């Protein structure tokens, strides 16, 4: 038993001198490996008298356990030391200036849409959507524009086939809403629309918001009041607004709403063509035939509708003079918003 104790003390003494993990592992193998010195001692048990065997086995196990615990402690110290050295080398200097990141922003059309939707939601309007590939029935027929009607010449339409088009307005959403919902109805229908036109003020695809209100005792005065409040809210100033008689097949009477030029405050400039006024939207009282197409009794209910181009309003709000800039993905332009 004494030789086992001496071997343990020798191994522990060697451990105290270890300076690295490799040497530590060499000592582990030397004493605790398959052919280690303490492991070999276990083979001597078979040669001892029966009363001595348990004593040697117990002594060897105690020595192995003590040595293994010492090795584990030494290994933990080495690993902690390595970690501290690594942390010291890789520490973050919080006094250094941070690295800037490019900050994204909303597209001006999206910002304008959000602004329009926020106003009408605050005034009790729901938001409805419809398909961009629309049937001739919903895009024209139900809106008092039959196939022979000259008003179809007002729309440069993309035809998918004989009965389907890329919608030229979101008015079809109004009919779909009236079909599934009884008055009172208050909705706006934002979305993409398509017309075969492209120049400085027109693109083949643009965004439009149309609105519909159907209820009892609705008047043109209600329409004027709502749109005047909207325009003041959108441009954040008390604007002069005028309504000029106009023509739309789906409303009667119909009007165009003009605002005092936001660029020159009505004094006259290139943007307003020196008239002092800017056309911003169309509106009118819903035609009885359109109400009937939506299964609404025109003898019992009245309604008004309005429509506006989102890009048009965005150009006026942000002072943009070319519609095509919205669709060119030029970061020099987009970063300004």
Curated annotation (Swiss-Prot):
Any one Pfam family here would be: Phe_tRNA-synt_N
**What is this enzyme's catalytic activity, as reactions?**
tRNA(Phe) + L-phenylalanine + ATP = L-phenylalanyl-tRNA(Phe) + AMP + diphosphate + H(+)
- The entry marks the following residues as binding Mg(2+), namely 252
Q: Does the keyword Coiled coil apply?
A: no
Cofactors: Mg(2+)
| Entry keyword Hydrolase | no
**Gene Ontology BP, a term:** phenylalanyl-tRNA aminoacylation
The record describes how the cofactor is bound as: Binds 2 magnesium ions per tetramer.
Record's PROSITE patterns? AA_TRNA_LIGASE_II
One Gene Ontology molecular-function label = phenylalanine-tRNA ligase activity
List the InterPro entries: aa-tRNA-synth_II, aa-tRNA-synth_II/BPL/LPL, Phe-tRNA-synth_IIc_asu, Phe-tRNA_ligase_II_N, Phe_tRNA_ligase_alpha1_bac, Phenylalanyl-tRNA_Synthase, tRNA-bd_arm
Q: Which GO terms describe its cellular component?
A: cytoplasm
* Enzyme Commission number: 6.1.1.20
> Where does this protein reside within or beyond the cell?
Cytoplasm
Q: Which UniProt keywords apply?
A: Aminoacyl-tRNA synthetase, ATP-binding, Cytoplasm, Ligase, Magnesium, Metal-binding, Nucleotide-binding, Protein biosynthesis
**Complex and partners:** Tetramer of two alpha and two beta subunits.
Q: Which NCBIfam families match?
A: pheS
What's the family?
A: Belongs to the class-II aminoacyl-tRNA synthetase family. Phe-tRNA synthetase alpha subunit type 1 subfamily.
Name of the protein described by the UniProt record: Phenylalanine--tRNA ligase alpha subunit
Q: Which gene encodes it?
A: pheS
């Amino acid at each position: 038993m004494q030789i086992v104790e001496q071997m343990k003390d020798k191994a522990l003494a060697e451990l105290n001198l270890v300076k690295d993990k490799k040497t530590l592992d060499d000592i582990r193998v030397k004493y605790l490996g398959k052919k280690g010195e303490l492991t070999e001692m276990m083979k001597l048990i078979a040669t001892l008298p029966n009363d001595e065997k348990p004593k040697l086995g117990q002594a060897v196990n105690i020595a192995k356990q003590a040595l293994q615990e010492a090795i584990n402690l030494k290994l933990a110290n080495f690993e902690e030391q390595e970690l501290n050295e690594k942390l010291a080398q890789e520490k973050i200097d919080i006094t250094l200036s941070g690295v800037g990141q490019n900050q994204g922003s909303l597209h001006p059309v999206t910002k304008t849409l959000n602004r329009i939707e926020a106003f009408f939601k605050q005034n009790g309007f729901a938001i409805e959507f419809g398909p961009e590939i629309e049937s001739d029935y919903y895009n024209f027929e139900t809106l008092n524009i039959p196939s022979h009607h000259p008003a179809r010449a007002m729309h440069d339409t993309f035809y998918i086939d004989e009965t389907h088009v890329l919608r030229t307005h979101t008015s079809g959403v109004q009919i779909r809403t009236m079909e599934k919902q009884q008055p009172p109805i208050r909705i706006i229908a934002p979305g993409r629309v398509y017309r075969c036109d492209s120049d400085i003020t027109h693109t083949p695809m643009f965004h439009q918001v149309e609105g519909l209100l159907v209820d009892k005792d609705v008047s043109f005065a209600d329409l004027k009041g709502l749109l005047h409040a909207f325009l003041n809210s959108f441009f954040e100033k008390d604007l002069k607004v005028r309504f000029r008689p106009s023509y739309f097949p789906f409303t009667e009477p119909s009007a165009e709403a003009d605002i005092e030029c936001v660029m020159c405050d009505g004094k006259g400039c290139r943007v307003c063509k020196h008239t002092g006024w800017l056309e911003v939207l169309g509106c009118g009282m819903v035609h009885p035939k359109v109400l009937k197409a939506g299964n609404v009794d025109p003898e019992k209910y009245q309604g008004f509708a309005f429509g506006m181009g989102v890009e048009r309003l965005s150009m006026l709000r942000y002072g943009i003079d070319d519609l095509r800039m919205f669709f060119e993905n030029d970061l020099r332009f987009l970063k300004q918003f």
